[in-house]
Swiss-Prot record:
The gene is RCS3. It comes from Oryza sativa subsp. japonica. Pyridoxal 5'-phosphate binds at N80, G184, T185, G186, G187, T188, S272. Keywords: Amino-acid biosynthesis, Cysteine biosynthesis, Cytoplasm, Pyridoxal phosphate, Transferase. This is Cysteine synthase. The lineage of its organism: Eukaryota, Viridiplantae, Streptophyta, Embryophyta, Tracheophyta. Transmembrane segments: none annotated.
Length: 325
């Protein structure tokens, strides 16, 4: 507890949320609307999933489903939810086992292990379905285990309804017209979108999914490079009725935009942020959106993707550098 006059957080969980918004200025050619990015890259562990790491564990504790030091937490993850859970598990004293497709970045593996999590890699061709299946197998053999089920857990969208949505409404003084959010579990777009539409039913909600795995648009699941979205199935927590439209973005478009955001806006973001930005720009370029305000969620920090295709060419260049005499 901070003394009077001090502003010191009681523990790391108190630092979650209240992330800033910033206008995009250099990548918005041809836009009729303004675009403001919600920087979830500024969470304690650098992603929007810090929110649900907190909410799912806290919710399970309040319901008496888990106990620190006794319960073993298990979760399938593409990485960022795992990190959100791992720092929470470390702070609260839980053993955590995570199942993750082997295609996810090396940084994710290292960070998860740094927090003490046990990591089980699954066949990348099976995507998140493979990770979910492995988590179920482990839980069936392990007493005192509990799967948090981010794709089905109501505590996922609930935290966005209680925090992310109100934060956007407050920061924009209620002037937000459009929300653009990538869809992984669907928790962010569902909780945030529900809150915003309750404040103003005219607000439009746009989801983003990979062109290569456009399930929500009626396509087939497939491999793609946009880590964190496009799980290959319709998540249970996603309320598709909130979506006014789903925008498809290719992996190449997402990667290119993520690079441009670093070079032109000074924002080092992940590939899914690039995808969300591409979608937001497309929506902002529509004549009917002239003068409106688009808020786009940037879910994660770019440093988590240094070993991925996003920085492949820069990594090679950096590795081949030699010192000057």
């Amino acid at each position: 507890m901070a003394e009077s006059g001090q502003s010191i957080a009681s523990d790391v969980t108190a630092l979650i949320g209240n992330t800033p918004l910033v206008y995009l200025n250099k990548v918005v050619d041809g836009c009729e609307a303004q675009i403001a990015a919600k920087l979830e890259i500024m969470e304690p562990c650098s992603s929007v999933k810090d929110r649900i790491g907190y909410s799912m564990i806290t919710d399970a504790e309040e319901k008496g489903l888990i106990t620190p030091g006794k319960s073993v937490l298990i979760e399938p993850t593409s990485g960022n939810t795992g990190i959100g859970l791992a720092f929470m598990a470390a702070a609260k004293g839980y053993k955590l086992i995570l199942t993750m497709p082997a295609s996810m970045s090396m940084e994710r593996r290292i960070i998860l292990k740094a927090f003490g999590a046990e990591l089980v890699l699954t066949d990348p061709l099976l995507g998140m379905k493979g990770a979910i299946q492995k988590a179920d197998e482990l839980a069936a053999k392990m007493p005192n285990s509990y799967i948090l089920q981010q794709f089905e857990n109501p505590a996922n969208p609930k935290i966005h309804y209680e925090t992310t949505g109100p934060e956007i409404w407050k920061a924009t003084a209620g002037k937000v017209d459009i929300l653009v959010s990538g869809i992984g579990t669907g928790g962010t777009v569902t909780g945030t979108g529900k809150y915003l539409k309750e404040q103003n039913p005219e607000i439009k909600i746009y989801g983003v999914e990979p062109t290569e795995s456009a399930i929500l648009s009626g396509g087939r699941p497939g491999p793609h490079k946009i880590q964190g979205i496009g799980a290959g199935f319709v998540p249970g927590v996603l309320d598709v009725n909130l979506l006014d439209e789903v925008v498809q973005v290719s992996s190449d478009e997402a990667i290119s935009m993520a690079k441009q955001l670093a070079l032109k806006e000074g924002l080092l973001v992940g590939i899914s942020s690039g995808a969300a930005a591409v979608a937001a720009i497309r929506v902002a370029q529509r004549p009917e959106n002239k003068g409106k305000l688009v808020v786009v969620v940037f879910p994660s920090f770019g440093e988590r993707y240094l070993s991925s295709v996003l920085f492949e060419s820069i990594k090679r260049e950096a590795e081949n550098m030699v010192f000057e005499p």
